[in-house]
Amino acid sequence: MYLKGLYTALITPFTPTGQLDEEGLKKLIQIQLHHQVDGVVVLGTTGESPTLTQIEKRRIIEIALEEIQGRIKVIVGTGSYSTQQAIEQTLQAKQMGADAALIVTPYYNKPTQEGIFKHFEAINQAVSFPICLYNIQGRTGQNIQTHTLKRISTLSSIIGVKETSGDINQIMDVIEAFRQSHPNFAILSGDDALTLPMIALGGHGIISVVSNLVPAAMKSLVNAALNGNFKKARIIHNQLYSFIKAAFIETNPIPIKAALSLSKLPAGSCRLPLCDLSQNHSQKLAQILNELPQEWISHG
């Protein structure tokens, strides 16, 4: 399996009473299908996976698979600070018919580099299923160093990495480490602002937050960059940049859910301990949305 292009990290919409909004989720998925993204990620950071019950997680996977019907890839976040739990969640994703798992570095318990390797080695041994690593030190407290990433990549199920270090030196090290020896190892940006720079340096695409609202624009940017049309990609990037910054003005997914709500799309509030966007930031976000080309914005 080869990952390339635009993958939307879907939010999880909630009703006013805080329940999973199943119809809202279906609508959001249909928007992504309409704009022909390459895949969606459910149960990731943007999907508020830490606050979802196991029943809700299973239902979200079911809805995604039912709506998509194999037309694009469905990637499921199955990571945990518990190796056994990560194995169980990855096995569930496989059995339900997903295409791949996105597995974050174990968080909170801060394993060593050897522990990180053994974590993924154990998952690889337990479940034969495509796995994309998720490196995001700002949330996990631990960085997958490039030499460790190289070791993990030799495991049979590992197909790529969502690189969200934000460190351009590390990003370059990762790209160079695989450019010759493993060119099909997918190196995906986890930071919308670095989509264009990463592809220009040799990356393969993006797992995007902002494409929840502007999938058409992000699809055009990614396609242009992957096809070497950096002039076009740069124009789109520059037009989107204010919104990209605003989408992270508070902790993700608070701002993107606010942006969806402002556009009359299903979102709802985040679950505690995440709370609603501040009034000041909401006003700023609304102004930025008004300044975007309106044909880019999905509306309810």
UniProtKB/Swiss-Prot annotation:
Signal peptide: none annotated. Pfam families: DHDPS (PF00701). It catalyses: L-aspartate 4-semialdehyde + pyruvate = (2S,4S)-4-hydroxy-2,3,4,5-tetrahydrodipicolinate + H2O + H(+). GO terms for biological process: diaminopimelate biosynthetic process; lysine biosynthetic process via diaminopimelate. It is an enzyme of class 4 (lyase). GO terms for molecular function: 4-hydroxy-tetrahydrodipicolinate synthase activity. The active site is at 134 (proton donor/acceptor), 162 (schiff-base intermediate with substrate). Its EC number is 4.3.3.7. GO terms for cellular component: cytosol. Belongs to the DapA family. Homotetramer; dimer of dimers. HAMAP family: DapA. Catalyzes the condensation of (S)-aspartate-beta-semialdehyde [(S)-ASA] and pyruvate to 4-hydroxy-tetrahydrodipicolinate (HTPA). This is 4-hydroxy-tetrahydrodipicolinate synthase.
